Amino acid sequence: MLQAENIKKAYGKKTIVKGISFSLKKGESFGLLGPNGAGKSTTISMISGLVPHDSGNITVGGYVIGKETAKAKQKIGIVPQEIALYPTLTAHENLMFWGKMYGLTHGEAKKRAAEVLEYVGLTERAKDKIETFSGGMKRRINIGAALMHKPELLIMDEPTVGIDPQSRNHILETVKQLNETGMTVIYTSHYMEEVEFLCDRIGIIDQGEMIAIGTKTDLCSRLGGDTIIQLTVSGINEAFLVAIRSLAHVNDVTVHELELKIDISAAHHEKVVTSLLAEATAHHINLLSLQVQEPNLERLFLNLTGRTLRD
């Protein structure tokens, strides 16, 4: 569905995107992550044909961006981070406008607008002006506008920013359903749990480069760091600490009062937990609580991009 090969973009002397490559199969859901200023928005703008790429090749649905951009755009629906709606028009009028912008006839746009309003759960508000809508409702119509021409590739740039939990849940379920019908999705967000819920594969961009790409399971197992076991115990003695520090697959043990944080190799936590229980029994120590924190997407992201704030 999408092929991006070594695409680059510079503004003046500053290179924003430094040769990114990736491809998507039809029906795949792809999460694109990165810190602020990493090059995510520029990348999706080039893919969608809104910003010309300086070099490299982009193909969408068999059409080459830069040569057959108009045909490629017919395959693409874009949900921008900003609300791209006219506030003084009704929800139905906004959808009709976007339908005609995509080349639908009046009849086609009217039929499709009714379908889209039902899809985003706003049929009853069709005749209300956008300026009367909540932030979450505007976001849902924003998505609806991108669906008017039945795109094969849906590009979503942080579509749940600043909305209520109910609207957020509705949007996520809508995206999931669209993907299950065969629509290809590129989804950018700073909410890691959304990407984990929606996406088959994940790409992480930093400083204009794709620094990691793969499934969540693959990336976390390779790059996500250690599994952490947190213990709260009734008491601690030196012999117990020596014993657990010498266990196979234990990389580090830190102690704070009666709490222990044990970093272990991710693939072996079941063996280590069994050994910990045995050592606690042998040293007459009662375990008050035990929690296992496996590598997750947020830890992976911070491991790769660092914890320094980005403007």
UniProtKB/Swiss-Prot annotation:
Domain of life of the source: Bacteria
GO molecular function: ATP binding; ATP hydrolysis activity
Amino-acid positions noted as binding ATP in the UniProt annotation, renumbered to this chain: G34, P35, N36, G37, A38, G39, K40, S41
Record keywords, A-Z: ATP-binding, Nucleotide-binding, Translocase, Transport
Membrane-spanning residues: none
Cited SUPFAM superfamilies: P-loop containing nucleoside triphosphate hydrolases
EC number per UniProt: 7.6.2.-
One Pfam match: ABC_tran
Domain ABC transporter, first and last residues per copy: 2-232
Protein's job: Required for resistance to linearmycins, a family of antibiotic-specialized metabolites produced by some streptomycetes. Part of the ABC transporter complex LnrLMN that probably facilitates linearmycin removal from the membrane. Responsible for energy coupling to the transport system. Also mediates KinC-dependent biofilm morphology.
Subunit structure of this chain's protein: The complex is composed of two ATP-binding proteins (LnrL) and two transmembrane proteins (LnrM and LnrN).
Family: Belongs to the ABC transporter superfamily.
Name of protein: Linearmycin resistance ATP-binding protein LnrL
Source species of the chain: Bacillus subtilis (strain 168)
